[in-house]
């Protein structure tokens, strides 16, 4: 034991450390090579890696030893902390915990207790701590274990259905029993015992834990049912076709097929080729879906693509390849190549409470009833009276409509709130004829149309769905200005539509400024709606107004007022019937106005198509 002078007082320190470190037997002198600041060659801090945590732990340990005179633990065995700890104490029952249980004791190349407090180095000159390798016996870093490669091998064992051809005790002992550390679970050692799965097994088609969209069809080869699986995005046909043997027969589907053959198949299309399958078990496999629905014909299995579970997809991708971030939602879409296959599928289902169900199994559930929701083509349109005329100027657009909603159901909901409806059309995909989640509704009267625009929302209820959707004006293309009938814009089509309930008209640039800034100050905050392709956009300001000259909720200058007064007087001379007319009367009499203006329209009109791409705010 030796006595060392510290800033906090004298405290005895053992000359033998826990890890057999070499201690400093003599303090470096200020006049020697130490340089007076602990920076000499004899300083213990130059040849070691010391951090602020080590220095603080040293002083805390010294302080506890000075005030507590050592913390003892009764009946502590000699081998509790190893042989070296027992050798350093004559009596193991009086083991000095502060001397050994401190962070500084875990550094194998420095004895901090042997240093002097007046020779502490500057913090900026202390190098960062570099931990040594935990694997003893490696001579260099290249021979150490590659944990990244080990993780890949373990994931391969989980994700892939690897089979061990030599699955004997000797084979496994040769795999894991190694003589040298460098050969511990290396890539060559594991790969030699991993056999690639057969292409005829079902798991070979599944790739790295993700469900892929596949075109499948069940056929009979040598009196055995097999599934022909193909990748629709593959470059060549030979590279995308695989054969998967069925391990068992789907009895529920076979019984349904026998029952469907007894029912007639319509020659006219009755359903969309796209079918929704809901209520799937969470652990259902791709092969079970293929084997269940592939009997009805060639079908594309389209799994949902949106991410689920808030970014936890990586966890599900490692779960034996059955679930991932985009295929755990419990439903799937089927796109059949022939519409008659959909009719056979519906005929094979069981009807319960106006819903169709089919049995499907999973590793944890046997013969679960899943819902088969086919879209009827007769539910696309609804006409209140087929002989009545439909005024498209009284049409509204409704987005976010639930896909199972029929046109008649939507018409019933709107008539309960706003008035009589003459037509409802569900927007569908032109190829598959499947709903896109939007609809167009035409009201029978102008009062109902204005009431629906003012209400803005409607509650759509169908079966188990109950959703609140928004009502917007339906903007059409190739429409003339409702104020000037094209007289002030050289008979060009009107670029803007005002969707506010006080306007609901198409405007040219001149009439927009006159009606929103010159005649009414309370219309200055109205935003124009423009039609671009199949979409309708609401712009923050008219594009013909530059950003520097556009003032929100402000009236034009005196020069602009004089210009608008001239435009107003010229407009009233050409169309005196537009003065002091209400919005309802303008909508009701619009057909007559369009017929009168069509006679004075030149045969050649320039179509409006110049909508600015970049619009400043």
Curated annotation (Swiss-Prot):
Compositional bias of kind Basic residues: 542-563
The protein's name: Cytoplasmic polyadenylation element-binding protein 1
GO biological process, one term: spermatogenesis
GO cellular component: cytoplasm; neuron projection; nucleus; synapse
Domain RRM per the UniProt entry, residue ranges: 273-377, 394-465
Function: Cytoplasmic polyadenylation element binding protein that binds to and regulates the translation of specific mRNAs. Essential for progression through meiosis. Involved in spermatogenesis.
Record's keyword annotation contains Repeat: yes
Region ranges (Disordered): 1-38, 534-568, 592-617
Assembly, per entry: Interacts with fbf-1.
Gene3D superfamilies documented for this protein: 3.30.70.330, Cytoplasmic polyadenylation element-binding protein, ZZ domain (4.10.640.40)
Species annotation: Caenorhabditis japonica
GO terms of molecular function: mRNA 3'-UTR binding; mRNA regulatory element binding translation repressor activity; ribosome binding; translation factor activity, RNA binding
Domain of life: Eukaryota
Keywords: Developmental protein, Differentiation, Repeat, RNA-binding, Spermatogenesis
Cross-referenced Pfam families: CEBP_ZZ, RRM_7
């Amino acid at each position: 034991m030796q006595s060392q002078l510290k800033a906090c007082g004298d405290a005895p320190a053992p000359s033998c450390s826990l890890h057999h470190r070499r201690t400093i037997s003599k303090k470096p002198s200020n006049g020697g090579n130490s340089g007076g600041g602990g920076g000499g060659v004899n300083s213990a801090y130059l040849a070691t890696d010391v951090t602020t945590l080590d220095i603080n732990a040293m002083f805390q340990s010294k302080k506890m030893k000075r005030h507590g005179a050592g913390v003892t633990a009764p009946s502590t065995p000699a081998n509790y902390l190893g042989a070296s700890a027992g050798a350093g104490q004559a009596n193991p029952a009086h083991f000095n915990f502060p001397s050994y249980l401190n962070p500084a004791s875990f550094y194998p190349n420095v004895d901090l207790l042997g240093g002097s407090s007046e020779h502490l180095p500057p913090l900026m000159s202390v190098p960062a701590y570099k931990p040594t390798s935990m694997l003893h016996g490696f001579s260099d870093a290249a021979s150490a274990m590659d944990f990244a490669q080990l993780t890949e091998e373990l994931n391969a064992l989980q994700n892939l259905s690897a089979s061990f051809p030599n699955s004997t005790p000797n084979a496994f002992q040769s795999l894991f029993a190694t003589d040298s550390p460098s050969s511990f679970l290396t890539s060559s050692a594991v790969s030699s015992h991993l056999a690639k799965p057969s292409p005829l097994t079902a798991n070979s088609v599944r790739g790295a834990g993700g469900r892929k969209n596949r075109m499948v069809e069940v056929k009979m080869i040598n009196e055995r049912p097999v599934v022909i699986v193909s990748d629709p995005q593959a470059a060549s046909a030979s590279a995308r076709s695989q054969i998967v043997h069925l391990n068992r027969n789907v009895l529920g589907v076979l019984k349904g097929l026998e029952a469907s053959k007894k029912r007639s198949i319509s020659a006219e299309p009755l359903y969309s080729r796209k079918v929704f399958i809901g209520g799937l078990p969470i652990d259902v496999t791709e092969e079970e879906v293929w084997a269940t629905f592939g009997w009805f014909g060639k079908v594309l299995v389209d799994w949902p693509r949106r991410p689920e579970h808030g970014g936890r997809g990586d966890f599900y991708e490692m779960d034996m390849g059955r679930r991932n971030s985009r295929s755990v939602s419990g439903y799937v879409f089927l796109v059949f190549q022939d519409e008659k296959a959909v009719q056979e599928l519906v005929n094979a289902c069981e009807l319960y409470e106006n819903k169709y169900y089919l049995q499907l199994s999973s590793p944890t559930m046997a013969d679960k009833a899943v819902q088969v929701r086919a879209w009827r083509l007769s539910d696309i349109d609804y006409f209140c009276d087929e002989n009545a005329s439909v005024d498209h100027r009284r049409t509204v657009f409704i987005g976010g409509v639930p896909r199972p909603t029929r046109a008649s159901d939507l018409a019933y909901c709107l008539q309960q709130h706003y008035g009589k409806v003459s037509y409802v059309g569900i927007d569908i995909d032109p190829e598959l004829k499947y709903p896109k989640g939007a609809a167009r509704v035409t009201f029978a009267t102008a009062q109902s149309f204005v009431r629906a625009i003012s209400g803005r929302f409607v509650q759509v209820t169908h079966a188990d769905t109950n959703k609140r959707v928004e009502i917007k004006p339906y903007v059409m293309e190739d429409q003339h200005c409702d104020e000037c009938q094209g007289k002030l814009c050289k008979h060009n089509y009107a670029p803007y539509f005002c969707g506010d309930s006080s306007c609901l008209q198409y405007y040219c640039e001149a009439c927009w400024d006159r009606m929103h800034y010159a005649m009414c100050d309370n219309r200055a905050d109205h935003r124009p709606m423009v039609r671009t392709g199949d979409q309708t956009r609401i712009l923050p300001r008219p594009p013909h107004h530059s950003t520097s000259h556009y003032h929100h909720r402000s009236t034009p200058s005196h020069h602009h007022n004089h210009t608008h007064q001239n435009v107003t007087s010229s407009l009233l001379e050409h169309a005196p019937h537009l003065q002091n007319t209400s919005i309802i009367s303008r909508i009701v009499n619009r057909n007559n106005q369009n017929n009168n203006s069509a006679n004075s329209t030149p045969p050649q009109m320039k179509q409006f198509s110049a909508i600015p791409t970049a619009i400043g705010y």
